[in-house]
Swiss-Prot record:
InterPro entries: Ribosomal_bS18, Ribosomal_bS18_sf
GO cellular component: a single term: cytosolic small ribosomal subunit
Pfam families: Ribosomal_S18
GO BP term (any one): translation
Entry keywords, A to Z: Ribonucleoprotein, Ribosomal protein, RNA-binding, rRNA-binding
A GO term, aspect molecular function: small ribosomal subunit rRNA binding
Entry protein name: Small ribosomal subunit protein bS18
Highest taxon above the source species: Bacteria
Keyword GTP-binding: no
Gene name per UniProt: rpsR
NCBIfam families reported for this sequence: S18
Transcription regulation found in the keyword field: no
Length: 107
């Protein structure tokens, strides 16, 4: 009998580096629109797995982002929206079960 190897069918999930395909050698820190593609919503530098860049271009992008931050072209962090809860009073802080017990005792 012949030994047949199982062929795994699947897609090639690996992305090609956008910078390699367009032959970009220098990532300009002044090009804020281009750099913001590599920054998350919080302001962190995205990893190469999510951006699809190769290691060489990931280093160049990271350096460009750091330079742009230092030159105050982009912020270090994004503004977070903070929702403050209203101060709880003594009546609203009690659990409903405790309220029911107090009402039963009072009646």
């Amino acid at each position: 009998m012949a030994n047949f190897k199982k062929v795994k069918k699947g897609r090639n999930l690996r992305r090609k580096c956008e910078l390699c395909e367009t032959n970009i050698e220098y990532v300009d820190y002044k090009n804020v629109e281009f750099i913001t593609k590599f920054i998350s919503g919080i302001g962190q530098i995205k990893p190469h797995v999510s951006t699809g860049t190769c290691a060489r271009h990931q280093r160049k992008v990271a350096n460009a982002i750091k330079r742009a931050r230092f030159m105050a072209l982009i912020p270090y962090t994004k503004d977070k929206i903070r929702v403050l809860a209203p101060a709880a009073s003594a009546n609203t802080a009690q659990a409903p079960a405790e309220k029911a017990k107090k009402e039963a005792v009072a009646a």
